[in-house]
């Protein structure tokens, strides 16, 4: 059985590798036509999707009754007509985005008729392992296709019926478009297949896990393949002593209440001691009216009646209507707390002092840092990136919400006319010019300047 799993997974990855080489040369019009075909098929097969999803939801609700699943997981699993339409529209929006491939990122003359170009290209074979949300399968497949990457998809067992059907729709819709290579998308389902996939670091170029912090940590700890993702979303809002307190209250409430289950919701509210007595009573009243369970440090509890916070609270991603509050001395104390306890995801400062804002924004270690705005804005769609494959808190390759650009890398292309390295070496070496210029790489043609 183990041999069969390894053989099957290896074969799927090999097929994806071969398809990736061909997909890298598929023109934008063909890739867009394939995406439009996916969107149309989703609408045409809506009833089938709803039936498959209903089976998943029914099984998940039984698991919920036994205490094995959470309500949040069941909620993320559900699809309806509105959601299916939004998925189709998302695919169309990906098609409408500018082509991320072939863009000349830089052009440099090394000498006459010797030009170096840095050009955006696909990564190759990307794998995604995700939990709960069946819409993630379509979203990631669409982004992979647009960016010229082959993709290996692994969804959670709780969405198995939905995932199988959605994969079938994606595969059949793109197979109907001339020029799209067969095998560019692969579906794996068994946990053993994931373990084997994570061993194939010579064949798979990138893994993108989406799920709980424990789930992402498991992926990171069990592969040598580069992993793009984040383990936690411990986000903070800092209310500075010079904040507009009315605005601060609205932002602080939005950052927690608008959608508490997502990774960009605030988990800890930091309040400058200069405004603690004037700010905390009002915002606590608002939180309590929204059903938020509050915890606070000793200084917070001197002002408002909330449960005591523990050290563990400062590093907890609640993912629910829960919030910790801490009173701090100043912006520097706030920065220290964030850097000691944050997850490098998203942080926000509320202040009318631009110098204090700059201090905070440049001093905290996070992929996104906001001034006078809710942490909930940390999202690829809201950033204008279109759909996203996830959020990366790493500092290499891609950071923050990752859209199409994050699924590309680059190659150096050198266009010459028979130049020899020997010409540029030794006592009479010809000097390089090393001049930057505006130009687009065209195969076999040097720039006309």
Regions found by a protein language model. Give the residues of each.
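Conserved small-residue-rich beta-alpha loop and adjacent elements
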Residues: 89, 93-173, 225-227
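A structured beta-alpha segment of the ubiquitous adenosine-cofactor-binding alpha/beta core
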Residues: 76, 80, 115, 185-204
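ALDH superfamily catalytic-core signature
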Residues: 131-135, 139-150, 165, 169, ...
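C-terminal core of ALDH-fold dehydrogenases
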Residues: 33, 282, 331, 336-448
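N-terminal Rossmann-like NAD(P)+-binding subdomain of aldehyde/semialdehyde dehydrogenases
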Residues: 1-114, 143
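Short, structured coil segments at secondary-structure junctions
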Residues: 147, 202-203, 223, 290, ...
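Short, well-ordered beta-strand elements within core beta-sheets of diverse protein domains
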Residues: 19-25, 270-271, 320-329, 344-349
